[in-house]
């Protein structure tokens, strides 16, 4: 059986980059006004980004950005965007965490990591509880970056270049693991925010969980 070749267009504005894990980019999913609305909703509230440690969230040299959390209905425009994200990934918006707005200044990055949780670790179990595993990541680029700042998937040999309005969708977990009752990390979903070489980068993350969050 012939292996699938990537990237490949699956719609006029959708490019598939992998089937394991599912990874695709939707061009111009967000309008300029919608991108700007996310940034305006979070400006003035940004704090240094953290990573998960066994007991708490801590700052770490592997993640040098700033972020804040934004509610799905923080404004009418974001409420409508939330509906579209739900339709895009075919999951209820109530399964999703709040939006995470992230700002990368020149030189900032987020080294390769997993979005899903390791249930074999104490911190993984703790973060798993409110909603279950992170199944799907929606990552939207809110501005054009002058140089650098791509999203790299080292296990796939894929780098997605940031372009304002584009959304990257990828699946994080193995749903049919025979060795566990829980959806486990797909090791091929390893990814990172590459260093911003020139300019700045604004993105928003939306993580969809197994179960309802509210």
Outline where the language-model segments fall.
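Fe(II)/2-oxoglutarate oxygenase catalytic core
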Residues: 1-214
């Amino acid at each position: 059986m012939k292996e699938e070749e990537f990237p490949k267009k699956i719609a006029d504005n959708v490019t598939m980059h992998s089937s394991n894990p599912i990874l695709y980019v939707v061009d111009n999913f967000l309008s300029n006004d919608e991108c700007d609305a996310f940034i305006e909703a979070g400006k003035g509230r940004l704090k240094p980004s953290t990573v998960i440690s066994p007991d708490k969230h801590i700052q770490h040299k592997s993640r040098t950005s700033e972020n804040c959390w934004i509610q799905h209905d923080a404004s009418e425009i974001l409420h409508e965007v939330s509906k579209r994200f739900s339709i895009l990934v075919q999951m209820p918006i109530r399964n999703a965490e709040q939006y995470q707005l992230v700002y990368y200044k020149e030189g900032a990055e987020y080294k390769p990591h997993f979005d899903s949780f390791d249930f074999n670790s104490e911190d993984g179990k703790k973060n798993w509880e409110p909603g279950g595993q992170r199944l799907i990541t929606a990552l939207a680029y809110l501005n054009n970056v002058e140089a650098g700042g791509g999203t790299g998937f080292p296990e796939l040999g894929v780098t997605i270049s940031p372009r304002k309005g584009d959304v990257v969708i990828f699946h994080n977990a193995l749903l049919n693991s025979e060795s566990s009752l829980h959806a486990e990390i797909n090791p091929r979903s390893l990814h990172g925010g590459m260093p911003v070489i020139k300019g700045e980068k604004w993105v928003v993350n939306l993580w969809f969980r197994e179960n309802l969050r509210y």
